């Protein structure tokens, strides 16, 4: 992960640190999708993060997890999963007064994807758990490949989930929104279960997610998604606030020689408006 991620983004991060925060930090979100959780594995990740801590968005570890401490925002934000094994290393073993380098997801009840938001994620954010990771099935329970038309009712469901997340001080992420041909699926090794079947179908979901304030959108078609999100942003020369808070998710297919260290990494570039980000850092 050092060579694959940190050293590759070094020029971006060092330039950002030199120029200072202009309201667009964090520039990069590193989402750790861990496929094994041996204590030694997690400890090695923590030790690596500590070496780059000046780059990382952090919060102070206090005596109570319930209180969300203000984030010290830096160019990189690191997110991880919801497991207790990860929390044990990334939060429990951090000394009081120390820094949290990585933030976990709240636990999601996946038994009924159509359940009300409070049934899916009953726990609010805390000092460690700051985001909510969702399969798209919580919006369209039949799944991407059988989703059918995008409707007013589906958009209302998506809006309900986003409002619930933000009302509980959580960033919200959905995975994975693709609209590829069969040939593209075959050539790239993408999962058919994540595929809406056409550009038109997935674009409607991308646009709705951006409009409603979804914080992270995961897609294998990151270049097209990025272009769409960029087109939805106001001209930099204007003074109008950015109404969108979606982030571009770039899925890395493999980690090469360190694949046994971290099974998959997702790098996500935020385009959130500053005011919403600041509210989240304060837990307000």
Positions of the model-derived regions?
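Catalytic cores of phosphodiester-bond hydrolases, prominently lipid phosphodiesterases
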Residues: 1-283
